[in-house]
């Protein structure tokens, strides 16, 4: 059994220049592995809690307290445990914290240890992480949901929708899907320049032009897809992350595109978009606590498009189970730092798949060079991954890892393609 011998931690910087936690785990057999923890910009109220230092250092965003939690409390609790006993290790972490939202030790401290333990166990077993976590049948390469126009909390513009994504569903392989996405991305830059629009980048590597609204952004992307020699819809479909919680006020409604709208009016807006554009997925179209609106929206258009719960579910099995019972959404966004351990993440994915919900593995806007989520996407067979534009090394690192995995799988590799979106029919677009 690969026994945990050492646990270390340090404060490093993420892609936004903010501190985050990196954990190193050493085993008795000499294996050493590390994991770095991401951080979000638009965070759900129900997420597990990051531990930040406050004060003036790093403008209050330091993580020395989380590092101390790893060194002083977590390390003594897990040293001597088997790294291949992931569920036991993660339960020990949850029990040690003792709070429902991991606020005592910090989800950033706990997750760093959880992931580093899994990576060390895989390395000790001489298995790639995707194979160690996913077993012998892990072979599905996900569709890269590339965020090529950034708005909302990811950019300083007037665009309310947070992410405009492309999904290269018609590609024959992940390698080709990545090429198509990169070509559309560069094509979009040329389109923006020709129209005199800004080509500065948002947090996730997408362009951040100031546009009049959602349709203008979708039209620009459609033009870029065609300019790249690809077909809008059958080759490259479109997707949104609205992040509606960011512009929702209880009792007032949704302050969206210079109007105050009800959930019903937002639903009508999305229905109109579906008639005009080949959208395969809409994430967080309504606020995280607007359960009635979610249920009505799912009943209205859930048979036509993937409706993804991010802030709604926060990768939490309890909230997901509630949503399944209510009939809210039909897909789960998977962010490991929302729940705080690998075991709980895998439990949420299993619950979603068993209920017929799709899953999309996801990065955060504050990322590092850590590529764990690329392996997890293949391990759980999510068929979709959201990890930014094909630009900025913290985003590209995940795509490059998926290229390596596809190459390692060889003839056994299968690219999810349009099978990842069974509700989408290009003939109707």
Swiss-Prot record:
Family: Belongs to the enolase family.
UniProt cross-references to SUPFAM superfamilies, sorted A to Z: Enolase C-terminal domain-like, Enolase N-terminal domain-like
Protein name: Enolase
Annotated metabolic or biological route of this protein: Carbohydrate degradation; glycolysis; pyruvate from D-glyceraldehyde 3-phosphate: step 4/5
Keywords tagged on the record: Cytoplasm, Glycolysis, Lyase, Magnesium, Metal-binding, Secreted
Intracellular or extracellular location(s): Cytoplasm; Secreted; Cell surface
Superkingdom of source: Bacteria
PANTHER family registered for this protein in UniProt: ENOLASE
GO MF term (any one): magnesium ion binding
Described function: Catalyzes the reversible conversion of 2-phosphoglycerate (2-PG) into phosphoenolpyruvate (PEP). It is essential for the degradation of carbohydrates via glycolysis.
Cofactor note as given: Binds a second Mg(2+) ion via substrate during catalysis.
CDD domains in UniProt: enolase
